[in-house]
Structures are given as structure tokens and as C-alpha cells.
Amino acid sequence: MSLRTLPTITPLALTCAIMMAATSFATAEPTQWKRQGWKTDFSKTSIKFAEILSGGPPKDGIPSIDQPIFKPVAANTDVGGKEPVVSLAIDGDARAYPLRILIWHEIVNDTIAGMPVTVTYCPLCNSAIAFDRRVDGQTLDFGTTGKLRNSDLVMYDRATESWWQQFTGEAIVGEMLGKSLKMLPARLESLGQFKTRHPDGKILVPNNPTMRRYGQNPYVGYDSAAKPFLYSGSMPEGINPMARVVAIRNADTSFAVALSLLREKRTLAHAGVTLTWQPGQNSALDTQNIGSGRDVGTVSAFIAGANDATTPIPYDVTFAFVFHAFHPNRTIRIK
């Protein structure tokens, strides 16, 4: 039984399931993966295969959404106003992807205003990132491998079956090794905030409303856990590994700021980037009912220009251990 396909799970059951998964799959390597049907070129890798663990599901066991269905956000009656959504707007086409859906599917392959995009969410990292899914002129479709590295979702493209790290957007195994996906300036915000900014926007709805228990959180209490699951790396210093941080990774700089600090200051400038925080967004990883989760607020990130112009930039509200795992030489600003 997969911890990421359970209809609901208690913290104790989740811990047991993860310990079983870690024990069962710690020795997985290319020979076994090939027996599972993978056509990946495992001779090309930038990582140690021992870093890869299985979260339980097989390839595509967590099904991506490849033919997304939307309805006008004004017609929504299912998603609560404070529930978290990943929002992305391109050339006036604004779309909201509720975490109540993404928590069960993790990947949505979509096209917005002619741009092929993939919208992703890794629950164990609380990492919500959108990418342009074009690489060297080729449009890729992404699926779930069922595997994790540093507790983070490992995706694969269906053209070459190369494996991609969701948190970085980089191909880590296979023919596409060394290629990177361009991150897009998506925002994790409440549905109410999205609706205010984009009253004519669209919201993703389930292809099959009975396929999963949409609106329910299968990781109850995870963001209050003492330590992360399926992670054996070093922990960040001076901050709880499960504390939320705002991670900025653009062409000029990579840094992280503790969400608690931003929440206290409301507005904070760092390395030329302005961050803001406002209340009104539920945690998707707190209570069983996502709509009842505690308020963790909404972050925006932008670069200020001339005449009060602002340019949104990609950011991520993730856990401190995740940023540390992928950027061990970077410090997290806590004061």
C-alpha cells in the first residue's frame, strides 16, 4: 500500500509506512529499475543512485493530469476561499490549480496562452513549482516516477524517460542529463486572493471527482512533524528543519528567508528581491480537511523597477530541510 495513494492516513500510520518504504527500497538500483520496465539511460547520471528512494507507488502510480479540465473561478462552489492554489497567469490567461487536487496527482501538464507548462507539487517538501516544459524546441510531458530524492518528487519525461528533480527542474538521470526546465513565476495563494486578482480566471477541477478524496489531506499533521520523512541528509542549523522558508532561485542569486521572519516584518528586501506576506491561506498539510488548515499566509516575490513597476519572479515556500539539502552552502536568513 502506497503512503501517497492512501485515502487518509494518521501521523503514526504515515511514519510506519515511510519506514517500511525506506527499508524496502533503499537498495534499489538500475538493474531493478530496468526490470520494472524503465527505458531510462542509467549510464548518464549526476547523482548517486543510493540517493533515490521509493515513496511506494510505481511509475505513474500517482497519475499526472494530462488533459486538465477548468471552469470559471466565479462558478466555483467546491474549493474554500482560503484553500491554497498554485496560480499562474500568462498573457492574460490566469489559472488556479488547487492543492486539494495536486496533493493527489503532483503534476499537471497544461498549455496556457500557447505555452506548454507543467505545474507540480511535492507534498513531502510542500514545494509548488511551475515550469515551461519545452526543452531545446521539444515539448515534454511529465509523469511521476514514484521515487524521491532528498524527500523531493522525481519526475520523468515520457519522450526519453529521463528523471528530473522537481525542486531544481534539472534532469539528473538519462538522456536529458544536464538539461534544465525554466521556472515560471507561479504563486501559491488562497483561492480568494486569486479570485480577487483574476475575477475572470479559471480553476482546475477533477477529471473524475470520485477518483480521490479531493479536499482531504493524506498527510495529516505533516508540517508539524519533528523531522522530515524519507530524508537522511544533514539538517539546517539554527532553524527547525520543518519550518517554512521562502526560497528564491533565479539567474542572479539563490537564497532563503524564514517565513516566520517575513510574517513578522510583512515586507522584506534581500539581494534585490522584495518579499511580502499577507494572511489568508490555509496549510494543505495540517488538518485532514484542507479547508480547515491553519493560516500560513501568502507570499509574493518581485523585483522592483522604475516608476513603481514590479516584475514577479519564481519562488517557492518549502521546508528548511529541502532548501538546505539542495543548497547546503547557502544560509537561511532567520533574522
Regions picked out by a protein language model, each given a short descriptive name:
Residues 2-13:
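Bacterial N-terminal signal peptides that target proteins for export
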Residues 4, 25-27:
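Basic/polar N-terminal segments that are highly enriched at the extreme N-terminus
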Residues 11-22:
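Bacterial N-terminal signal peptides
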Residues 27-335:
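Mid-to-C-terminal functional-domain signal that highlights helix-capping/loop sites
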